[in-house]
Amino acid sequence: MRAHRINAYEAAPAAMKTLVAVETYLHQTTLGARLIELVKMRASQINGCAYCLDSHSKELRKGGESEQRIYLLDAWHESPLYSPRERAAFAWTDALTRISETHAPDDVYDELRRHFDDKEIVDLTTLVGMINLWNRLAISLRYEHPVP
């Protein structure tokens, strides 16, 4: 695999500024920083984005998340460590990240409605869309995570 291809911030600063503005908005919502980072980590696991996995695992640790919850996120459906609200968010994240296969199933949406209001569902859906966009930018432009 080739090294880094394009620096998106240099090539399209206005586009990147807009994406960062959406991220700023998302961090002002009622979703909460921890859930936001867990959702970003989960989508990044599905997409196989090493750059984003590195970044979001560090953010989770900085925010006080336990190593066990970070490690087991890939098997969230088998672990009792996550709340019903988190599990509903992860199921929605999985469904939207794999949307060509799932088409956002009604049962997943119905469970989501039990834990999130309309605005939160739109915010969560925006969050999932954004991390999928970031994953695609990082993977396609070959962003590399730091190596200690």
Identify what each model region corresponds to.
Residues 1-148:
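Hydrophobic alpha-helical segments
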